[in-house]
From Swiss-Prot:
Has four distinct domains: an N-terminal nucleotidyltransferase (NT) domain responsible for UTase activity, a central HD domain that encodes UR activity, and two C-terminal ACT domains that seem to have a role in glutamine sensing. SUPFAM superfamilies: ACT-like, HD-domain/PDEase-like, Nucleotidyltransferase, Nucleotidyltransferase substrate binding subunit/domain. This is Bifunctional uridylyltransferase/uridylyl-removing enzyme. Belongs to the GlnD family.
Amino acid sequence: MINTSPLLNYVSSHHDIKAINQWRTDVEKQLQDSYENGQSIREIIKARSDLVDEALVFLWKHAELDQSKLGLFAVGGYGRREMLPYSDVDIMILSEDEISEENEKRISTFISSLWDVGNFKPGISVRTIQSCVEQAATDLTVATTLIEARLITGNTQLAKWPRRIVSQTWTDKTFYDAKMAEQAKRYHQHNNTESNLEPDIKNAPGGIRDINQIGWIAKRHFRVNRIYDLVHLGFISEFELAVLEEAESFLWEIRHHLHRLAKRDENRLLFDHQREIAAKFGYVRQEGQPVNYGVEQFMKRYYRTAQQVSTLNEMLLAYFSESVITPRLPNYERKIEVVNDHFKIVDNKIAVQHHKIFAEHPSAILELFYILANRPDIEGIRARTLRLLILAAKRINQSYRDNPEHQALFMSIIRSPYRLYDTLVAMKRYGVLGNYIPAFGQIMGLMQYDLFHIYTVDAHTLLLLRNLNRFREPEFAKEFPVVSSVFQRLARQDIVFIAALFHDIAKGRGGDHSELGAEDAIEFGRAHGFTERECKLIAWLIQNHLLMSLTAQKKDISDPDVVKDFAEKLGDMEHLDYLYTLTVADINATNPKLWNTWRASLMRQLYTHARDVIRTGLGRPVDYQMLIEDTKFAASELLVNNFALADVEKVWQELGDEYFIKESADEIAWHTQAILKHGDNPEPLVLLRAHRKAAQDAVQIFIYTRDQPNLFATTVAVLDRMNLDVQDAKIITASTAFSLDTYVVLDRFGTLLTDPEREETVKNALVKALSQPDQYPGLMQRRIPRQLRHFDIENTVDVTLNEALQQNMVEISTLDHPGLLARVGGLFMMQGLDIHSARIATLGERAEDIFFVTKKDGKPLNNEEVKLFSEKLKAALDEASNQICQH
């Protein structure tokens, strides 16, 4: 038990009412000691509420309000006896009639004393019964607080009034409708998901508010004080109550730790606190486990808990509507459509014909979802049926999974062209999908502790399936024209659906998740009617689901050898088509910020180039001379009407073969035209245009200037100052010692090509900086995003030799931060290295960048130089990461 000094004795011994402040501090320490010694969080928060009661009663008497006919009520969480360390103390002073002048003075004394105490954070309302009626009638928040108003001290005759007022001012239907609208708004504010990276454990879907919501609506109608009382009324089962209470205790415990760590009323489970709170629950990484194992397992428990809470919230409130609200509507007539012997449609929702359907006909579990998938007019599942379904899902075992009828039903759901995503989400939510595919059950709620994967693995997987399904819908053909066309001509679309379902299914197990997932998929495919050849294709897609994105992200896809190597790994058009659709859907399901028209253009270019190689013949070597001649001819056709061919060729003869291999005819014509118009002007030439292949997002910046040691470093430093993010860079040095540089950038503000003044500012800034090669622009100091400080990313530097180019390829992986590229460019400059090309990728909090470099003499670094440079670059990245973490 929690033993505390009686407040009266404590204050008397200190001869000062402000001693309550110290008393509460001492009490809080005792409560924490009790918690750490094993006392339940329920007992702790109730004890804290009771102790606050004691303090308020003392202050009430001190203000001589015990001599009045007023009542002091606890409302909100305090009214429910749910006080966390820094919770608000919400109270209502209620009077039957107008408050006398004398009582107003007493109330003023009471409120002043409450503030004088110091460590209370009071929220105070003073009302008469009449004002309560008036405010409750128009203010849902007031009505809600009255439902749970608890008399602490004072006039006991007032105790009955708060709920009576709500009954007078709100009907069951108006209150239910208002609270459901309020919940929908709250859900929208939290992205309508339980699995935000930094969830608000109080207000997000599946949080404490969802449990409160059940209580508010049920207490309003059934006039009970506790959710427990609803068991006896048949509104909630003992099992459901146990699930809610366990979830509530877990959420309270998290909130308890959040309050103590933040030293305030904090409900957001921020990255700042996740790892530390995970440790308090015992989720600590053991030796040999991934660095984020502990925090990921803790968050997995949270997400699963939130899913349980939101599911019960949905079911119980739907049950209330169907059993209490709807039958009482004027002129209500139940609409029933018989589907078959197992199911009927009642008021547009599917329902079982009788309560033993799932027990007597286990196949009906999947049959229900087959009907949902193929009947877009059905609005959901009736609450009684949902309750039976959730229990029935727990009985899905290996025998159930091995049943050919069940396997055929599952594949019929997967092949449904109508509501695949919504159906699979429902199957997951109600426990069917995770029990039918146990490996999927293991990834439910699994998050990856980073900013790149913004969804849990299960949510990401279902979004991927949604994206694939959208490729066959006309409304999305504009957004994904090429991939939609490719998807619609796939011979077996269900092959890519199963590959999608299993592509990440082995995450969290350790080992290579692609290999393990492929093994699971082969076993599943054989059981579900796929041929051995089809199973191998599914497995290959899972094993190689990152191949296309990594090739586009990390390699120079303008290099024919890169494309040829990629095409050879695929072997035929079938593998290319399936992989392309899977890759585009996967990227779009990972992080909305990851997909843009620049990345789309990379995927499209890689697909079309690989398609051409496969159609031409994989065994044929690249004919570089023919490629160069074809490109020159196409470029000259674009220039012939405006420039003399001799002038064009004079520019071209200064450029090497690599330029004509890697640049398109359109880009060569653009560059050549600009150079010829620029003439002998000594000032650097800077041009901007929308990227022709990437539509609106990406901007091409072309720079023609005398070659200089710090060219790349200066350029990226200026671009960073201009809020432009470099995605790609090509630096070509002509024999005339001029440099032709093309940068692809994304504009953080999206106004670069629509705001002439800003475009001119960017041009002028580049011209000025490049005209003063000895004055390298300093790095701009930017605010470090809060989230970045909590990620422990190992900095890696890998320097290899590209034999064909005779250039060093420098790959870095580090914590992304403002000015990173400018910092790295400056280091290359100080080490006397020339950058010939760069490929930039930002994956959440991680930057994975690739640079091709040589020394000033055009030669690559030798082994000793590589070792020394790698150490210096690694040290610089480590220093930058440390500064971020300490910021």
